[in-house]
């Protein structure tokens, strides 16, 4: 009996063979298919054989984020179930500590030296440094295949949900749903619309109002005007009403801002939204969310939405646009006196261009609801006002609820043997402004709040962990005794206290040249005149003849001398308290010391000590050290001896010791081969990790 997934694989491959090789090749394929389908497919039951849940940024260590003790105390009952039914311990990430590198490590069983994902934004020779020439969140960045690709070769079908590095899709069977920032599909990020009168915020954000500092906008500054041409009865306003025109992704929505209270403070408190000034889309008080509202958004397929790359003519981009019917949810974050507003739009993160097979997108939305994949974005936007914190918590709840609902869908509606599932919201919480710096005793901000305030913050963080625990409970309920459940994470999070603006240092040394726009805080690098620059997350590029044009690794006495000068200045760098932020510097040819590939790093790789983080921004004040608004991070930290970077590792299923605490922290590279051993599958030769014999029966 041919299964549905076998038939889909057959017809998709057969169609391609007919088109390319004719019916002779088709006949050969059918014979191979008959042989293949005569073999068992490895599916033991109707339940998934493996569910690997990888919440992003879920810190777990024995000192402060004592997750296993919380579980023993009853706070996390489903963590406790997995601990009792399987083995558990801590896992250590790889440098430089953040998401794309460590997901690639988990899913290939290799370090960056082998899988090649040295960073999120990577620069390689032959391309201008102004542009990211290799994106670490893209599946094509990996030099070796991930676990789902290897398993598919053995006719094991994967379901992949919100996994960084999974798109463009690498599997022909199964399901791929919205890989994060992989450059695949039509993704509309949440956005804040903020008063253009707030010049201080605009200057402070600079490029920080865009996805990864170069993508589509995450905050847009707008002006108000008097209301005009409304064809409906507008609510009475006790202050002069104002109007904003919000156009995003080709859809225009008007906002009528008014004061519904008859008092003397002239504080506006409400916004009525309409797409045509004839019908009401939503009428919201300050602090309220709308329901999901239908919108039609336009995506220019000839536009990469990257401010650093050349663009086609506007008419050509316009002709290339396609329309997406989707939904928006609106939050009035904050209002104030005349012309001040802060409004947030979050869009349904799911459409047919973000799911493969595409027809499943509609079914998911109908079954589970519009997708809220994660809260906020990178760089974070919900860090500037007290009301941003409330909005963050509400949006995080939407994300956690959606992912909890998706467990049953993935387990029962996708016909997949193995499932890989991530959620980014834990990372967003621990690297935001509001929590980690005030609850971790290693943070200089720890004493800035009272014990009572800290207890409230801990309560909010532990609630997030409880909701992750709820998702784990739903996973358990959708597995059976023959299934494996694995829980891990890519990295933890460390308190961030001070930003270190290395490019300000290089500008002061006369090694970096730029022009600053004093109005919006954006700047333009003079690459030809710039000899040294820091670029995310841990790379310094050096050329005594300038860094203009396509990047090529320099060499010779002048290069070596300049590189040594830069190293000395970095090692001597200290803040006003004499604390030096540099932990380690290695030359590109020694990148193997940090398990990094030489061809995808800068001329220097520089690691920062905890509480200090490298920032690419250039500021007009030329300050090198600045207290960070964010209070958590994970980039450019050597994780081995920084326990705050550690993560959980729990595994249960046939052949795994029960109620067993792993004696020492493991390495991320050991998770993949352990899973493959338990599944009874061959471990590829490129894998650097080894199975954890300690936990096997």
Feature locations, PLM:
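Secreted, luminal/periplasmic, and some membrane-associated catalytic domains
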Residues: 44-46, 55-57, 76, 80, ...
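C-terminal segment of N-terminal export signals and the immediately downstream linker at the start
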Residues: 1, 22-48
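Short, solvent-exposed turn/loop segments enriched in Gly/Ser/Thr/Pro and often Arg
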Residues: 87-107, 161-171, 422-426, 492-495, ...
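N-terminal export signals
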Residues: 6-27
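Short, surface-exposed loop/helix-turn segments at secondary-structure junctions
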Residues: 617-635
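Short, structured active-site-proximal loop/turn typified by the sulfatase FGly-forming signature C/S-X-P-X-R
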Residues: 63-105, 109-113, 157-159, 514
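Substrate-binding rim/cap in mid-to-C-terminal beta-strand-loop elements of soluble/periplasmic
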Residues: 502, 506-556, 631-679, 693-696
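A long, amphipathic alpha-helix that forms part
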Residues: 44, 62, 74-77, 390-419, ...
């Amino acid at each position: 009996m041919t299964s549905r997934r076998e038939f889909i694989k057959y017809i998709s491959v057969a169609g391609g063979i007919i088109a390319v090789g004719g019916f002779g090749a088709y006949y050969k394929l059918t014979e191979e298919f008959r042989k293949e389908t005569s073999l068992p497919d490895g599916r033991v039951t109707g339940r998934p054989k493996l569910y690997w849940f990888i919440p992003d940024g879920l810190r777990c260590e024995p000192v402060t984020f004592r997750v296993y003790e919380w579980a023993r105390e009853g706070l996390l009952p489903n963590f406790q179930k997995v601990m009792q039914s399987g083995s558990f311990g801590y896992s250590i990430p790889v440098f430089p500590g953040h998401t794309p590198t460590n997901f690639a490590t988990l899913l290939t069983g290799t370090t960056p030296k082998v899988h090649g994902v040295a960073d999120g934004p990577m620069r390689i020779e032959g391309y201008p440094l102004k542009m990211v020439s290799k994106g670490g969140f893209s599946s094509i960045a990996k030099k070796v295949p991930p676990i789902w690709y290897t398993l598919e070769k053995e006719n094991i079908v994967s379901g992949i949900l919100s996994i960084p590095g999974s798109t463009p899709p690498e599997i022909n069977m199964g399901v791929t749903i919205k890989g994060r920032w992989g450059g695949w599909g039509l993704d509309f990020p949440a956005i804040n619309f903020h008063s253009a009168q707030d010049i201080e915020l605009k200057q402070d954000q600079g490029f920080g109002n865009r996805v990864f500092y170069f993508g589509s906008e995450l905050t847009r500054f707008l002006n108000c005007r008097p209301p005009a041409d409304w064809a409906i009865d507008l609510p009475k306003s006790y202050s002069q009403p104002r109007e904003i025109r919000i156009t995003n992704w080709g859809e225009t929505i008007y906002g009528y801002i008014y004061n519904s209270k008859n008092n003397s403070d002239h504080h506006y408190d409400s916004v009525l939204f309409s797409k045509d000034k004839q019908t009401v889309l939503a009428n919201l008080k300050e602090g309220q969310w709308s329901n999901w509202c239908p919108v039609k958004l336009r995506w220019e397929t000839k536009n990469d939405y990257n401010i650093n790359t050349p663009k086609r003519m506007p008419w050509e981009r316009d002709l290339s646009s396609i329309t997406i019917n989707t939904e928006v949810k609106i939050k009035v974050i904050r209002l104030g006196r005349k012309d001040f507003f802060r409004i947030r739009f979050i869009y349904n993160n799911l459409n047919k261009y973000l799911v493969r097979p595409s027809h499943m997108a509609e079914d998911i939305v109908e079954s589970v609801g519009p997708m809220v994949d994660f809260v906020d974005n990178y760089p974070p936007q919900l860090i500037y006002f007290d009301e941003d914190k409330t909005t963050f918590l509400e949006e995080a709840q939407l994300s956690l609820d959606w992912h909890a609902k998706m467990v049953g869908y993935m387990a029962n509606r996708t016909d997949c043997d193995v499932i890989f599932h991530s959620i980014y919201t834990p990372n967003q919480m621990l690297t935001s402004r509001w929590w980690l710096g005030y609850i971790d005793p290693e943070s200089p901000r720890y004493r800035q709040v009272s014990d009572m305030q800290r207890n409230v913050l801990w309560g909010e963080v532990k609630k997030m962990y409880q909701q992750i625990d709820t998702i784990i409970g739903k996973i358990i309920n959708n597995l059976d005794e023959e299934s494996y459940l694995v829980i891990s994470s890519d990295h933890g999070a460390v308190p961030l206290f001070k930003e270190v603006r290395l490019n300000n240092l290089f500008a002061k040394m006369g090694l970096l040249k730029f022009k600053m726009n004093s109005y919006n805080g954006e700047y333009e690098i003079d690459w030809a005149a710039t000899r040294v620059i820091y670029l995310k997350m841990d790379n310094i590029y050096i050329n005594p003849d300038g860094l203009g044009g396509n990047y090529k690794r320099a060499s010779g006495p002048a290069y070596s001398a300049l590189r040594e000068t830069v190293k000395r200045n970095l090692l001597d760098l200290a803040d006003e308290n004499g604390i030096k932020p540099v932990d380690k510097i290695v030359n590109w040819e020694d990148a193997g010391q940090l398990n990094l590939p030489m061809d995808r790093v800068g001329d220097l790789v520089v690691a920062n000590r905890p509480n200090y983080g490298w920032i690419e921004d250039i500021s007009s004040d030329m300050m090198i050290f600045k207290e960070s608004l964010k209070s958590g991070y994970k980039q450019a930290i050597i994780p081995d001896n920084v326990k705050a970077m550690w993560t959980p590792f729990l595994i249960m299923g046939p052949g795994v010791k029960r109620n067993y605490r792993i004696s020492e922290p493991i390495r991320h590279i050991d998770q993949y081969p352990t899973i493959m051993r338990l599944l009874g599958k061959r471990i590829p030769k490129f894998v650097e990790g080894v199975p954890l014999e300690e936990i096997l029966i």
